[in-house]
Amino acid sequence: MLEFRFCRALCDIARNIEAQLKFNQVASPTMSFTDPLAQLNISPATITHRGLREYAEVAELVLVEMGADGREHRLTPAAAAAWQALKAAALANGITLIIVSNFRSVQRQAEIIQAKLAAGQLIDDILRSVAPPGHSEHHTGCAVDIASPDHPTLDISFAQTAAFAWLTQQAGRFGFTLSFPEGNSAGYQFEPWHWCFQC
């Protein structure tokens, strides 16, 4: 009986280790940057022409908060601490900030583009608002897409909100910058919701 319990305990430990390894695998680079680009017919010339940086997937993530939809929002430890401080300061000024999107794997980035292609969108149009896999700040675990309760969707009109006005004035104190202002050199549309902690 004792031997059976010992074997069962070992099996439980092995299952826990396997689950942890699978989780870590999600948060570490498993694909070369060229593979997903080729699969999506994204030309290397497009990347070069726009001067897009490569971003590797971060290895260490922590749970920041749970979204209203039940999704886990994860960032690097430093970005998570900065986000909590930013969010608390905003709240003290009557501004509620919500994370809509955060860490995203290379594979997930490719899936987003694939879904848009399947819906009939052209790749050049997609790449005005979605970074190619391997070139998204979301891979770093330092980028957040931010909304507010009165403006929960990610669109350009977020720039007209009190939340955006507050972020524009205060986010820099917490290490966050607006990644894609109007006329940005990377060629993305204006994204008032996309802010990145300078890790």
Feature annotation, model-predicted:
Residues 1-102, 106-199:
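Extracytoplasmic cell-surface/polysaccharide-interacting catalytic and binding patches
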